[in-house]
């Protein structure tokens, strides 16, 4: 539950910052939770 909550916050930040929209997904994909 906590991980999904963090991802939701991350998605909100991604919407605000387009650059993170490319970096965040790569980090999340590289780090398999």
UniProtKB/Swiss-Prot annotation:
Induction entry: Expressed in the late phase of the viral replicative cycle.
Spans through the membrane: none
Role summary: Major capsid protein that self-associates to form penton base pentamers, each in the shape of a pentagon, situated at the 12 vertices of the pseudo T=25 capsid. Involved in virus secondary attachment to host cell after initial attachment by the fiber protein, and in endocytosis of virions. As the virus enters the host cell, penton proteins are shed concomitant with virion acidification in the endosome.
Designated name of the protein: Penton protein
Domain of life of the native organism: Viruses
Annotated Gene Ontology cellular component terms: host cell nucleus; T=25 icosahedral viral capsid
Chief localization: virion
Keyword Cytoplasm included in the entry's annotation: no
A GO biological process held by the record: virion attachment to host cell
Other known facts: All late proteins expressed from the major late promoter are produced by alternative splicing and alternative polyadenylation of the same gene giving rise to non-overlapping ORFs. A leader sequence is present in the N-terminus of all these mRNAs and is recognized by the viral shutoff protein to provide expression although conventional translation via ribosome scanning from the cap has been shut off in the host cell.
Family recorded in the similarity comment: Belongs to the adenoviridae penton family.
Tagged with keyword Transferase: no
Subcellular location field: Virion; Host nucleus
Quaternary assembly: Interacts with the fiber protein (via N-terminal tail region). Interacts with the capsid vertex protein; this interaction binds the penton base to neighboring peripentonal hexons.
UniProt keyword terms in alphabetical order: Capsid protein, Host nucleus, Host-virus interaction, Late protein, T=25 icosahedral capsid protein, Viral attachment to host cell, Viral penetration into host cytoplasm, Virion, Virus endocytosis by host, Virus entry into host cell
